[in-house]
């Protein structure tokens, strides 16, 4: 018979006197020592130690703040009577003899005893017991109640979890209770080590409300029943939680001590100094609670751990590895919420989904993308960053059941819980900026489905709409699909529309969240097109002062050949008819080059070999025109390529026998002798692929920093974040024009950009500092240049010294622009996931081609095999060293992102998404760096 005995030092417990836990109580948990301060325990209730930095809303934005109950005692009293009722019924079940489902064998293990106690079938003489507390022996608790719980915050979050944790109404003996009792456990876990989520249609865990005594008294459970095995009791003494028993089989009163007579009993987890399982005390409450609520589902902190800042590198890596190393997390209970964007960022400003306390950007990782649309709680990578090969309809988002996360080696599937519609939003004020779109609220019925299948911001950039309707101005909003259709109406360039009703769907769609960006014709980015919140800040209009409109892009041949509205001949500037002999040229220059090379004409310039070759004067000097053709990379034996963004282009370029480079005769020599061209003549040529890389280099980007005001830590970091956002957009545009990159799978394209964006930015910073200020300062942008004095005055001086190493290496090695362009592409291809890419073969071919281009770029300056090999070693060693340097930037960026509210630092939307999705993986070692040399 289980007896509840009051805990005291030596004397019996007296009602009304406070009691304290004693050493050797049946339910203690070992205090884990760590770098976090332990919690102090008072005489009556466990007391939570205050966090040094408030993380409420920073890591886990509270969704239902407006629903906080006014009376906190009411919720606590409700939790009280439920445990009392469950306690008494389980005791009645255990004392009933034959009616108990617990096996009487002496050697029964903890597994069978916990299974039988928890999942006893419902019957006329039995009651449904409450589930046991989650107990995890690891020092990193994933979603159990061992995490610190803040008692004052409990009532504020009880109503949030009620749709997920409370069972629906049902009778005690229906078949749903039997189904719940025979659920298959997750593989690799014992019943006492998993989180038991309720299933839809299961009966209530009811408990009869009992009048409490006015004074709380902590009691402990002692095992005295002779039918219980010794190993079960021994495991209990080691901190294993178990179901509690209460009343006798005959329907008598619960057997408790006098101090706890007729009192409700509730489980109160005691805070641990780190992450170990809490002690469980049975504490009387002041008022009864309505039945139907689980005492274990009281606060969000039962399922989420909020780390105490500052975070060390080792702790962050270990914690993230714990969350991400399982290859099939399919739940959204908050595994990645620790890295969710702060409430101050636009990505955290979306409309909350009722019943969920976490933003849509925090999901569990998914090692292998599935065929169906990514569900609301299904993927660690944010839906706004998960790009699908084909756009799917909204019906896929309603598939059921969804997989919810259960701690264990494999996920357990539970049916959907009903989620209420988001609250209606009042109409926004008219736009005050030119071209700003009026944001309208999406229909409530489609909010959830559109949030789960909405298009990505990177997808909007990578896949520009070809058949889009004409815009009202240079910055008019692009059309979007209806919320139910899922994703923006931005199909691939090469993919036809898969929906016959796409035009009709777009006609009735709400406009995009933000006005179009105007970055060379790119559509505007939005976090999730169907999740709209009143007063969502407009992030991008300030960029418009620094970016060129569409009207200017058609005048320059420095963008992707396929995306240009008019293709320009690289020789004379006329309209190009295609790629001829390896270069984009017009038909006239194509025929001229062919006749000049095949006829072996000897042309002589009447001037100084610097004649202007354009559409009007291209026939004036054939010698200068032919020289310009050769310098552009035209080779008579080369293939006639239709498209430059194919890997076969680079393979074919290697087959072209480019002559060995020699110096072009200077002007004095040209005046005294004839300048003869022939197919076998040695001329120094820039390889055509490097020439293309030079043409697609992004324009100068400004930071928008106000240099008239004194520098502060928050203003500098905010300006750098705004600059980083613009550079990230520029990287996406640049990679879209990169030959071979569009051949990779779309998921691989996004992954490579997310893994390498920091490397590309700091590498570009080093190049600008090297070219403009000779490596003496950090040239972030023309309006943000930090000399050594400004570096010392900043709060990240050590980080500036780290970044300063790159331009100093450029000065030391005297890197040429051709070498820089090839190294920049290799940086984009320098980090891949541990499991590899989907287009791994195409990726390796592309990377090998650009390595050969780097060798060609080295050969333009270095003569001889030995010097070229030494140069190649020096440059590739610099690329390898960037991995460790960028890792320091990643750690600083993530810590600043987590503490952005406390530091008053703003993070733009797209940058926030990339940081929250990928930086934890990178810092935890979940990626594979591709090194040229062994360490």
Swiss-Prot record:
A GO molecular function annotation here is:
zinc ion binding
Asked if Thylakoid is a keyword of the record, the answer is no
Task: Name the source's superkingdom.
Answer: Eukaryota
Span of the secretion signal?
none
Polar residues bias located where?
32-44, 191-203
List the InterPro entries.
NHR-like_dom_sf, Nucl_hrmn_rcpt_lig-bd, Nuclear_hormone_rcpt_NR3, Nuclear_hrmn_rcpt, Progest_rcpt, Znf_hrmn_rcpt, Znf_NHR/GATA
Going by the UniProt record, its keywords in alphabetical order are: Cytoplasm, DNA-binding, Isopeptide bond, Lipid-binding, Lipoprotein, Metal-binding, Nucleus, Palmitate, Phosphoprotein, Receptor, Steroid-binding, Transcription, Transcription regulation, Ubl conjugation, Zinc, Zinc-finger
Cross-link Glycyl lysine isopeptide (Lys-Gly) (interchain with G-Cter in SUMO) lies at 388, 533
Give start-end ranges for motif LXXL motif 1.
55-59
UniProt-annotated binding residues for progesterone: 768
Where on this protein does the Glycyl lysine isopeptide (Lys-Gly) (interchain with G-Cter in ubiquitin) crosslink form? 388
Please give the DNA-binding region boundaries. Answer: 569-641
Show where the record puts the motif Nuclear localization signal: 183-187
Phosphoserine modified-residue sites: 20, 81, 130, 162, 190, 213, 294, 345, 400, 678
Q: Which residues form the NR LBD domain?
A: 681-915
Function of the molecule: The steroid hormones and their receptors are involved in the regulation of eukaryotic gene expression and affect cellular proliferation and differentiation in target tissues. Transcriptional activator of several progesteron-dependent promoters in a variety of cell types. Involved in activation of SRC-dependent MAPK signaling on hormone stimulation.
PANTHER family from the UniProt entry: KNIRPS-RELATED PROTEIN-RELATED
By what name is this protein known?
A: Progesterone receptor
Specify the species.
Answer: Sapajus apella (Brown-capped capuchin)
Its taxonomic path starts at: Eukaryota, Metazoa, Chordata, Craniata, Vertebrata
